[in-house]
Amino acid sequence: MNKFYVKTDSELRILITNAATKMKLSEEVVEKDYWISFLLDYIFNQNRWSNSFTFKGGTSLSKCFNLIKRFSEDIDLILDWRLFGYQDDEPYIQRSKSGQNKFNLEMNEKVTTFLKDEFVKVLNEDLKEFNLEFWIDPNDPNSVLCKYPLLFEPNYLFNKIKLEIGCLGKWTPAEHVKIKPLISQVYPDVFKEYSTIRTINPERTFWEKALILHSVCNKPDEN
């Protein structure tokens, strides 16, 4: 059973309302954080491919390390390329530019096929009892959208959770981090256990974001 399962909607509504009031947050933020935490626990502890995922990105900085205060709505995941039969360092073998592009395209096609034909199917089978629905984002074959049962009308947040999943990033350095929903900051005894999530080291995440910012700032002027 999921570590963050709450039996009834009425109980969950009370927990979210009171936590939001005490933390001076909107109910929709606390509600979405609850379902993000729920999904993370499932992916890293109950899903059949749990050992092949690593959590990364801005949401990991706020959720796992409390290093940024911005509420991040998406779940970014690295999928271990060894799941598809590649060797540890196969993506880094010396290739021509066209050869590397071909390799990257082949790997990405394997990921999107896996997500569409296997991963989404298992998500819907495993989590249908919690009224969660999953499908491939029609605008991005590397993303899975999750519709969760809304107890509060969203005002500014996207009312789906997006799982962004790629295979081209290295899954190290990583560490195992314990998380709970925001609700536990007000009700520490509601969830008896933490969920342990394998997460990319925050120094690497900051470094990657710095490189992205550098590349954007140094992009040639098209004019």
Report the location of each language-model feature:
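Short secondary-structure transition/capping motifs
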Residues: 28, 32, 67-68, 104, ...
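N-terminal regions immediately upstream of nucleotidyltransferase
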Residues: 1-38, 87-95
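Catalytic palm subdomain of template-directed nucleic-acid polymerases
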Residues: 79-113
